[in-house]
A protein has these predicted regions:
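Zymogen propeptides
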Residues: 20-118, 136-137
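Positively charged n-region of N-terminal signal peptides that target proteins for export
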Residues: 1-7
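General beta-strand structural signal in soluble alpha/beta enzymes
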Residues: 92-96, 129, 217-221
Length: 256
């Protein structure tokens, strides 16, 4: 078979599968520890609108926990995620919610059971840990009850109950959080690439067999210059800096 014919057949096969079927095989998960996996993904071509370079952590809830990090707990209004992660003695961290001028948090924050910032009436999502289980809900579903140890309000939501939502046509650097069907937590940042929110929703929604993250629910966190990720644990080292410090983030801790 000629090189030209092989190229034509490969092109047709990619069109027939939506252009993303190779992602799962080409970018396998790397096991860092029991319950902690990492992968770096580069996706280009249909059905995505732009090149995406993604850094992703998948966190098993039985072995690890996720907690909200607040810079004010360390005496400052903002910190780079690298510094905040280290200060909190987390093994990994990403940036969190929106903020006002002066780096004042915008939206609900609950840190280790204490409300650090009030709920905002907005069409956003809330990541929370209630009764030691992770959830993503809409603002209107929130009830200030007991047994909520962590909460972060931000948005928009990308996937709801396994359904990909329609996003505004906006492009930026992105940070996002998702929950898989197995209650694993996904932490994702883009690296050196601007991404459409719809493409991000699509990859969170798609099954793993088609190169996706197979999430039941997912939401965007603050993006643009706020986007950043840091991890230092065993053989894993990630350092994706942002454009400025942030008031809060999401940290990963090993259960004892």
């Amino acid at each position: 078979m000629s090189v030209f014919l092989r190229g034509v057949l490969l092109f047709l096969s990619l069109l027939g599968t939506g252009g993303h079927s190779l992602a799962s095989a080409d970018f396998p998960w790397q096991k860092i520890d029991e319950g902690l996996e990492y992968k770096s993904v580069r996706v280009d071509g249909l059905p995505y609108q732009t090149l995406m370079k993604l850094t992703i952590l998948r966190i098993g809830w039985e072995q690890f926990q996720v907690r909200i990090l607040d810079s004010r707990d360390h005496g400052v209004g903002r910190m780079e995620i690298k510094a905040l992660t280290r200060k909190a003695q987390a093994l990994a961290g990403i940036n969190g919610g929106f903020f006002l001028p002066g780096y004042r948090p915008l939206g609900l924050l609950i840190v280790d059971g204490k409300e650090a910032n009030p709920l905002r009436k907005a069409d956003w999502g809330i990541f929370l840990v209630q009764d030691n289980l992770p959830r993503i809900i809409h603002t209107t579903e929130y009830q200030n009850g007991r047994n909520i140890s962590q909460a972060l309000q931000v948005g928009p939501r990308l996937v709801v109950n396994g359904r990909e939502l329609q996003m505004k046509k906006q492009i930026a650097r992105r940070t996002a959080l998702g929950l898989t069907l197995k209650n694993q937590v996904i932490l994702l940042t883009t690296e050196d690439t601007d991404v459409y929110a719809q493409d991000l929703a699509h990859i969170f929604h798609l099954p793993e067999a088609r190169g996706g993250l197979e999430c039941r629910d997912a939401m965007a966190l603050d993006g643009g210059p706020s986007t950043q990720m840091y991890a230092e644990y065993k053989d894993l080292k990630i350092d994706i800096p942002g454009g400025w410090g942030v008031p809060n983030g999401v940290g990963v801790f090993k259960r004892r």
